[in-house]
Amino acid sequence: STNLKNMKKTISCIRHCSIEVLENGQSISCGTLNITATPAYNINRKRSNGQPFHIKGEGNGYILSIGSFKLFFAGDTEFIPELSVAKGADIAFLPKNLPYTMSDEEFIEAANFIKPKNLFPIHYFEIDPAAIRKSLLPGISLYVEGMQV
């Protein structure tokens, strides 16, 4: 479990940290908070000119960790191999938004691959929480609009 005293120290420390731009794979620490930039990009989703909506190497997701607690924010991405760095996250925010990120099926596949304890869909226009819930592995709690499904 996360020590709340350490979290207070981390939050206090954030006020005094400098801002740095991270590229894919780079990390920075501020007190007990560690931030790692992860790739976020498209493989299949492309503009009419053939260019991906999100180009590999340009966009980031982020892993924030304090001790053993890990939060993953995927950013604008599809289900890509690099999502493996988020396996077992305590909290994961995954995008579900065609045509720019993941379909329902890809969202479910990515969630079951990562196996976060708590899953929050983001960037969605429409969502069927009951259908998604039925397809998730046991042990993954799904939250939509702040409510557990």
Predicted regions mapped to residue ranges:
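Active-site neighborhood of phospho(di)ester-bond hydrolases with catalytic His/Asp-centered motifs
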Residues: 1-3, 72-75, 92-97, 118-123, ...
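Short, surface-exposed connector motifs at secondary-structure boundaries
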Residues: 65-69, 89-91, 112-118
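Catalytic metal-binding/acid-base residues of hydrolase active sites
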Residues: 5, 41, 78, 97-99, ...
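Active-site metal-binding motif and surrounding structural segment of the metallo-beta-lactamase
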Residues: 1-12, 20, 88-93
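Core dinuclear metal-dependent hydrolase active-site scaffold
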Residues: 21-87, 102, 145-149
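Active-site-proximal segments of metal-dependent phosphoesterases and phosphodiesterases across multiple
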Residues: 85, 91-112
